Regions:
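FAD-binding core of flavoproteins
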Residues: 75-78, 88, 92-212, 216, ...
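Phosphoinositide system proteins, centered on phosphoinositide phosphatases
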Residues: 84-85
């Protein structure tokens, strides 16, 4: 992860000023979204992973991951991580990166986009975050042994919008003989699985950030909520639950950061990246189940109300858990790798992390 405290502080300040969950809860409309997006775009955060020669900020992979983790701490309900991922994909396919919001497809392992012999795109992809709000959709495509990236104008696709568990916009996107603005091969050693692993790591970092936020919320509530003439934090059962929540949070943050560091520092070590990123998505997904249950237990009925901000974090965690493969899907792939390598290779694989 990035050591650039100025970047982290600047990102945090933007979110504190324009994306405070309590202020969003009280907002009467969505006008705050455009203000927030403008601030992020003007600061260069939306194009952090786009090289300078493509008009971006040219930040490192580690810097981008730090931006994403901070976004998770605020449960940012706009397509910043998706736009960062879209910019990374396009620039790694030598495609000029447009301004504005981007969605990335597919985010479900079984969904596919295909290229017809005439060059048009076909396929149906489900649950695409922020597709209805995006200006462009970036599609990753497996084609004849290579991986292609396509930039598509959203208005050329059929968008069937719905709300995710958190209320944030999602959509089923239908590509029906759609002409892309540009289609190029993904460069270097990057593959279709690389895209999935990058997406999984991004969601793991967001999950880790959001779990840090709900740990703070639950701990503060336990210190101030009085029952039987003393704060509930004094009760052993509550202390035990908070300790479990802290453990889940620490594990999620550690494994997500480990995956991010591997992607940033060993970009050509495909097996290490797969092991780290798949493990991160499995472990953070498990932490979502345990952590959100505990947070709602500690806060009780108030945590379920529309007025309280806890649901802004927990419901987004439930959404993020399934994006780019849930823990069950990644566990199958990770188990297959371990079985393929054989029992003798398992211990060295674990101890060299």
């Amino acid at each position: 992860m990035s050591d650039d405290n100025l970047l982290i502080d600047a990102t945090t300040k933007i979110f504190e000023d324009l994306c405070d969950p309590q202020n969003i809860n009280a907002a009467k409309d969505d006008s705050w979204k455009q203000l927030l997006w403008n601030a992020l775009e003007e600061s260069g955060l939306t194009s952090a992973w786009v090289p300078e020669e493509f008009g971006g900020a040219g930040a490192s992979i580690s810097d981008g991951f730090s931006i994403i983790e901070v976004a998770g701490k605020f449960a940012v309900p706009i397509a910043l991580p998706e736009t960062l991922l879209g910019g990374w994909l396009l620039s790694n396919a030598n495609i000029n990166v447009p301004k504005g919001i981007m969605a990335v497809a597919p985010t479900r392992p079984r969904d596919k986009v295909t290229i017809h012999s005439n060059g048009t795109l076909n396929g149906q992809v489900r649950g695409v975050p922020f597709a209805s709000e995006a200006d462009h959709i970036v599609a990753a495509i497996e084609d004849a042994g290579s991986t292609k990236v396509a930039l598509v104008a959203k208005n050329n696709c059929e968008i069937k919008s719905f709300s995710g568990l958190s209320g944030a916009p999602r959509a089923t996107v239908l590509f029906d003989n759609v002409d892309a603005i540009s289609i190029h091969n993904l460069q270097g050693d990057l593959s279709y699985r690389s895209v999935k692993l990058m997406g999984a790591t991004i969601r793991s970092l967001q999950i880790g950030g959001a779990l840090m936020a709900i740990l703070e919320l639950a701990t503060e509530h336990a210190k101030t909520r009085v029952a039987f003439e003393k704060p509930i934090a004094k009760f052993q059962a509550v202390q035990h639950n908070l300790a479990k929540l802290a453990n889940e949070t620490a594990a999620a943050v550690a494994v997500a950061n480990s995956a991010a560091d591997t992607l940033a520092n060993s970009p050509n070590n495909e097996q290490a990246i797969f092991f780290e990123a798949s493990s991160a998505k499995i472990r953070t997904g498990e932490a979502v189940g345990e952590g959100t249950a505990i947070a709602h237990q500690v806060l009780g009925a108030i945590g379920f109300t529309e007025e309280h901000i806890l649901h802004r974090f927990t419901q987004r965690l439930w959404d993020w858990r399934d994006d780019f493969g849930n823990e069950s899907e990644w566990a199958v792939e990770l188990g297959a790798l371990v079985a393929e390598n054989g029992a003798a290779a398992l211990w060295p694989l674990l101890t060299t992390r």
